[in-house]
Amino acid sequence: MSLILPLEKPALNLRPLLWLLLPLLVLATLFFWPLSLIVEQALRGANGEIGLETFRHVVDSKRFVGALLNTLQIAFFATAGCLLLGSAMSLILVFIPFPGSELIGRVVDTFIALPTFLITLAFTFIYGSAGLLNGTLMSLFAFELPPVDFLYSMQGVILAEITVFTPLVMRPLMAALRQIDKSQLEAASILGAHPLRVIGQVIFPAALPALMAGGSLCLLLTTNEFGIVLFIGAKGVNTLPMMVYSKAILESDYTVACMIALINIVLSLGLFSLYRLAASRTGVRS
């Protein structure tokens, strides 16, 4: 007669759930709860009811439409400038080494650690109305007014953001360029390929993931950049982060400020989704 022994169920291991609970609590406390407060404040109308009254009021405002267009224009032009300048400098530093190229690479790395207001302060000292360039030109050619006045415009903001965020493109791009097999470049040169063709058919496909990663990061940062626009004080240049600041701090209109901040968050998530879509279409893993 055989005995049938009951099978013992293994004890439930709760340790993985406990390890998961801690980061969820941190996210809920530091991110989801403040975000929910912003959403609740943005959707609460003047009568205290939840609705889209504030949203309709904001999107119908010409000031908001202008700030949205300025934000997108600055973000796209600054990102394009970062990609062009970062690509050119990375190609030179990696494939055309010269005395001091390593030092320049280290200086580029240090730019990432600098606060943005230091770059804008340097721009003010150089290109400002009483800066070094205008002072020199006015003393040499007896100009009555400063001849260089682009700094306090959208062009000045874009140039400052290109200077600040180009290293974010260069770091991953230079790392990717150093991984390219030099024998492929030598073979293309021996076969008589033009340098531009080598860049387009050999270097660019290998560097595309790094370009997309750096470009997407620049696009998100320039969309949400606040310090450069505020410090330069560009005339007539209002962006969504600047509008959030003015509504909350200067006008004490927290409901409208929260709604604009919520729209800015949705815009950033939309741009990031476009990047992920483009990355999946091109076969780039991210």
Curated annotation (Swiss-Prot):
Protein family according to the UniProt entry: Belongs to the binding-protein-dependent transport system permease family.
InterPro entries xrefs: AminoethylPonate_ABC_perm-PhnU, MetI-like, MetI-like_sf
Cross-referenced Pfam families: BPD_transp_1
Main subcellular location of this protein, as a coarse class: membrane
Keywords: Cell inner membrane, Cell membrane, Membrane, Transmembrane, Transmembrane helix, Transport
Keyword Transmembrane: yes
Species of origin: Salmonella choleraesuis (strain SC-B67)
Name this protein carries in UniProt: Putative 2-aminoethylphosphonate transport system permease protein PhnU
